[in-house]
Amino acid sequence: MATKIFSLLMLLALSTCVANATIFPQCSQAPIASLLPPYLPSIIASICENPALQPYRLQQAIAASNIPSSPLLFQQSPALSLVQSLVQTIRAQQLQQLVLPLINQVVLANLSPYSQQQQFLPFNQLSTLNPAAYLQQQLLPSSQLATAYCQQQQLLPFNQLAALNPAAYLQQQILLPFSQLAAANRASFLTQQQLLLFYQQFAANPATLLQLQQLLPFVQLALTDPAASYQQHIIGGALF
């Protein structure tokens, strides 16, 4: 495609030159002399009359003298500048076509570092725009790790106890709701601790345990409202 464009531009430049040029017969020597300005030395004009040396001598004479630019050169300069700009564009496209495969090969060879750079790109932009937020994000995994470490440290004695003595660990698991209740409501926990002593005392005697179950509402009433419990005892004594 680039070759076709270059060929068309060269044809355009040649057609411009041909359209602005004047055709003279080869046997005539007058046109060359007429093209030379009158202020050139006469020896240059005589040398240019030689047919073999005419093209070369004419070029030398024009290049050595300070001849004003002719209208023909002014007409040819836009076409030449256009050709030069297009040639530069074609060269840039060819260079790009040569460089892009090399870049792709480098990316494929270093795909892992390239992917890491793409992943870290938002963090780099954030560190540039807002360093404080970037530092918070950097400290966030450390904070999460510290929280998990503290939880593991708290559970470490229970894990060691479970490994050494499973029975004691199960007892602790059974008592865990009571511990949570103690943390949430201390009064209810104390009530349960008082009732636990009664359960442990009468667990060996089922009959006594049944009596304790029957008396449990009165015990709870005595713990919550001693005055009402005392009144119930007086009423019960009067009835019996």
From Swiss-Prot:
UniProt-recorded Gene Ontology molecular function terms: nutrient reservoir activity
Highest rank taxon of the organism: Eukaryota
Range of residues in the leader sequence: 1-21
Alphabetic keyword roster: Repeat, Seed storage protein, Signal, Storage protein
Pfam short name (any one): Zein
Record-linked InterPro entries: Maize_Zein_Storage (IPR052508), Zein (IPR002530)
Keyword Repeat: yes
This protein's record includes keyword Signal: yes
Further information: The alpha zeins of 19 kDa and 22 kDa account for 70% of the total zein fraction. They are encoded by a large multigene family.
Function description: Zeins are major seed storage proteins.
Family statement drawn from the similarity comment of this UniProt entry: Belongs to the zein family.
Descriptive protein name: Zein-alpha M6
Source organism (scientific name): Zea mays (Maize)
